[in-house]
Amino acid sequence: MNKSKQNIENGFSKISSHYEQLDKTSSLINWMRKRVRKHLYKELKPAAKILEINCGSGIDAVYFAKKGYNIHATDIAPGMIDFVTSKIKSESLKKNLSCQRLSFNELNKLNPQKYNHIFSNFGGLNCSSEEELQEVFGLFKQLLSPNGKITLVLMPKICIWEFLKIFKGNKTAFRRLKKDGVFANIEGEQVHTFYHSAKSTKKLLLKDFKNFKVENICFLAPTGNHVDFPEKYPVLFNTLSLFDKISNKISFFRGYGDYYILTASVK
């Protein structure tokens, strides 16, 4: 295993408990997650068979399994998969939820079967360069049933909230624009992170996919690391989240923010 993959494994295993805690305590993270789920609900078939890549500690996998969907959740980090395994047992979800420790660029190792939907939330695929993404996307079509769909949540290059850091003298304000990505410190592990515009992601998918839909998350609302912002500034947060809603009615703004959601159908 190369050093980059090892860092991803170690870093996200170490931070798995923190992610679990955030889901229980951060209203901002829950607001963001609800945005993704609302989008996804519109695209899912009843009782759909879903492949989740970069599932983390299984927060979304458990949620959708409880709603009657069939999920196979994968992640490279053993600490994350340990959480999913524990939840399958404690929540009696064996019928609807299975999990596997697997990197997103090893999807060819999955047992041969077809899925109605492939899902990846909150920037898991941002650990891939554009070249690596192209390889991953090349595996999607063979995993999907006819009329299957993908929904990917990625971090773009343009994030107004981060750009505003420049007024505080923060040198990371424009880190997303770096061509070769940046190294994020995940619990002491240096994880190479790349930012992908919605336009470039669509271009990589055009060979096998059509009917693209893009929606932003946190166009003007605070980025996900401002976990207590809604409690500290409730009126401002409600105003900014309203602008987020409005911005998604204007096609030009849909690929910008802390994240964007991209859904497409297989050709």
Could you say what each language-model-derived stretch is?
Residues 134-146:
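A short glycine-rich, Lys/Arg-flanked "PGG" loop and its adjoining helix->strand segment in the class I
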Residues 213-267:
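A C-terminal cap/extension of S-adenosyl-L-methionine-dependent methyltransferases
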Residues 190-209:
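Short alpha-helix
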